[in-house]
C-alpha cells in the first residue's frame, strides 16, 4: 500500500510540474509579443476586506528585454525604473532614492517578470493559468508579496496586473491608451537628482 501511495504522490508532483511549465510557457509566449509598450494606468488599492482605500494613476513603459518604468502621478509622485541590472525607486516627497540589484528584489518586485525571459527569474515563482489570467506566487517565504496576477490576452494585449500583499492589501493596475511606440533605452536610465538621500542597497 505504501508503494502505491508513494507512486501516487510522485505522479501528482509530476503533473503539477507539467502544469507549472505549461503555464510559464504560455505566459512567456504572450509576453514575448510585447516588444515595447507605453500606457496610462489607473491604480485601485483595496484592503483585505475588499474596501477601496486609495486610487491613483500614472504611466508605464516596457521594453524587452528587462527594461521597465512606472511613473506614478497621483495621489503622490513616485518612480520605479529597472534598467536590466538595477531597480531604482524614487520618492520625491521624501526626497529619497533606493537602488537594489534586480536579482535581489525578484520575490518582492514581480513587475520585472513582464519583460524577463531569464529562466532563473521564473524559477523563483509558481505560475498557474486561469483563462487569460496568470497567478504568480513567489516560492520565497520571506517575500512581502503573496501573489502577482497578470491578465493578458492570447494576442499579447496586456489588460491589467495586480499584487496582493501578505496582509491582504491589493494593488490593481488597469491599463488604457496602450501604444507600441519606439522607445529609446535612455528612458530606462535613472539619473540621481541633486540633494536627495541615496540608499544604495547594492553595496550591502
From Swiss-Prot:
Chief place where the protein resides: periplasm
InterPro entries, per database record: LolA/LolB/LppX, OM_lipoprot_carrier_LolA-like, OM_lipoprot_carrier_LolA_Pbac
Residues in coiled coil: none
Keywords: Chaperone, Periplasm, Protein transport, Signal, Transport
Compartments where found: Periplasm
Gene Ontology biological process: lipoprotein localization to outer membrane; lipoprotein transport
Subunit annotation: Monomer.
NCBIfam families in the record: lolA (TIGR00547)
Stated family: Belongs to the LolA family.
Function as written in the Swiss-Prot or TrEMBL entry: Participates in the translocation of lipoproteins from the inner membrane to the outer membrane. Only forms a complex with a lipoprotein if the residue after the N-terminal Cys is not an aspartate (The Asp acts as a targeting signal to indicate that the lipoprotein should stay in the inner membrane).
Protein name: Outer-membrane lipoprotein carrier protein
Organism from which the protein derives: Histophilus somni (strain 129Pt) (Haemophilus somnus)
Gene that this sequence comes from: lolA
